[in-house]
């Protein structure tokens, strides 16, 4: 049996300085431009509601911004029905040609009865079993970063 993966990271260089990439990421309404699943975002201060779609599944999550360090890192926790689900974030590292953007995901469904409930809700709402969640998210993160780079490229 394969060990469960709790954290995934993917990186890609974007041809803009860190502060410009941060500004794009911190405007959470723009997430639907590059995420293959996000279809709508409603921001309210340091919180926002995101609506996602994958195949026939549509679900929402309440998100709370937990790291807002301009030019360095932006991260938020996804909470569903009061249960912690995941932390999504972006670390920004300056490079000679722009910024290395590292998107990361950490599964927060780890302990006791809350974990079991959150896992069932995750399967029901997204159709992705816990054992495949990390691989699914890695694929989505790669696409997100490619779209982010295209949106932040010279023509942006």
Where do the PLM segments sit?
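Hydrophobic ligand-binding cavity/cleft-lining segments
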Residues: 1-44, 153-156
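Glycine-centered tight beta-turn/hairpin loop motif at sheet-sheet or coil-to-beta transitions
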Residues: 5, 56-58, 81-83
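Intrinsic-disorder/low-complexity, polar/charged segments enriched in Ser/Thr/Lys/Arg/Asp/Glu/Gln
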Residues: 5-11, 60, 73, 87, ...
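Short beta-edge strand/loop motif at the mouth of beta-sheet-based domains
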Residues: 9, 29-73
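A short, structured loop/turn motif at beta-sheet edges
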Residues: 15-19, 66-72, 91-100, 154-155
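Hydrophobic pocket/interface hotspot
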Residues: 21-25, 31, 48-50, 65, ...
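Short, highly charged C-terminal tails/helix-capping segments
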Residues: 43, 138-156
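Beta-strand/loop substructures that line and gate deep hydrophobic ligand-binding cavities in soluble
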Residues: 81-143
């Amino acid at each position: 049996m394969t060990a469960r993966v709790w954290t995934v990271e993917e990186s890609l260089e974007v041809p803009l300085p860190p502060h410009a990439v941060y500004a794009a990421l911190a405007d959470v309404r723009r997430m639907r431009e590059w995420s293959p699943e996000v279809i709508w975002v409603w921001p309210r201060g340091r919180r926002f509601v995101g609506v996602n779609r994958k195949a026939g599944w549509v679900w929402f999550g309440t998100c709370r911004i937990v790291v807002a360090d301009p030019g360095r890192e932006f991260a938020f926790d996804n909470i569903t029905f009061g249960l912690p689900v995941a932390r999504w974030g972006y670390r920004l590292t300056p490079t000679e040609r722009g910024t290395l953007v590292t998107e990361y995901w950490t599964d927060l469904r780890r302990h006791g009865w809350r974990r079991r409930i959150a896992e069932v809700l995750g399967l029901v709402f997204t159709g992705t079993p816990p054992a495949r969640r990390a691989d699914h998210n890695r694929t989505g993160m790669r696409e997100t970063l490619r779209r982010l780079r295209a949106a932040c490229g010279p023509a942006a």
